[in-house]
Design a protein with these regions (language model features):
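Glycine-rich phosphate/pyrophosphate-binding loop shared by adenosine-nucleotide-utilizing enzymes
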Residues: 4, 63-67, 162
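A short beta-loop-alpha structural element at the N-terminal edge
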Residues: 5-17
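Conserved GNAT-fold acetyl-CoA-binding loop/helix
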Residues: 18-45
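Acetyl-CoA-dependent GNAT
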Residues: 36-82, 86-92, 104, 109, ...
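Conserved catalytic-core motifs of GNAT/GCN5-like acyltransferases
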Residues: 69, 121-123, 137, 141-160, ...
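Conserved acetyl-CoA-binding loop-helix of GNAT-fold acetyltransferases
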Residues: 95-111, 133-138
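Conserved GNAT acetyl-CoA-binding A-motif
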Residues: 110-132
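Short, cationic low-complexity segments
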Residues: 181-189
């Protein structure tokens, strides 16, 4: 029986996390990024996110098999209660429930911070090909996200144009006098 653990990422995890991400940059349009960032650049990205938001890894038998994090939706004060999510799993670890577990943990932590709305920006093919399928959008829909917008031909990679969709999941109720969102460092256990 395998042991599955979700925990906060550490900067020391960056090399393994980058190894997972590099696959998606080099071989897919799941990431619209063209070049794999350096380890130093990736560590800096992690540090910036960790200043306010959770950055999680999921381990199976002690090996990091995926990661997910939240970050600012737009970067203006009025949007503080909304967060964009990102998730990547080792390509050999997909379809085993790890993504669901990781996203559920992330959503729980964001809810404790006071986040109300979750958003996912997803590459979407007009026609599925070897670089991009509709699996990510279907995964998000399965977790309760709803399609809220499509940007046509907005990403160009591997000499092809791809659409991008935004999906949304509401996890809290807005009201007048909404308490400020707390940094993750104040709510993590």
């Amino acid at each position: 029986m395998s042991t599955i653990t979700v925990r906060d990422a550490k900067i020391e995890d960056a090399a393994r996390i980058l190894e997972i991400y590099a696959y998606y940059v080099e071989y897919t349009v799941i990431s619209f990024e063209w070049d794999v960032p350096s380890l130093e650049e990736f560590e800096n990205r992690m540090r910036d996110i960790m200043k306010k938001y959770p950055y999680l890894v999921i381990e199976q038998n002690g090996k990091i098999e995926g990661y997910a994090y939240a970050h600012a939706f737009v970067g203006r004060a009025a949007y503080d209660w909304s967060s964009e999510l990102t998730i990547y799993l080792d390509p050999n670890a997909r379809k085993g429930g790890l993504g669901r577990r990781l996203y559920e943990e992330l959503a729980d932590r964001l809810k404790k911070m006071g986040i109300l709305n979750l958003y996912a920006c997803i590459g979407y093919p007009q026609v599925e090909d070897e670089y991009l399928t509709k699996n990510s959008a279907e995964f998000h829909a399965h977790l309760g996200f709803e399609l809220v917008g499509t940007f046509h031909n907005c990403g160009y990679k591997f000499d092809r144009w791809y659409d991008m969709v935004w999906m949304e999941k509401i996890i809290g109720e807005p009201h007048a006098g909404q308490p400020a969102v707390k940094p993750y460092s104040e709510v993590k256990e």
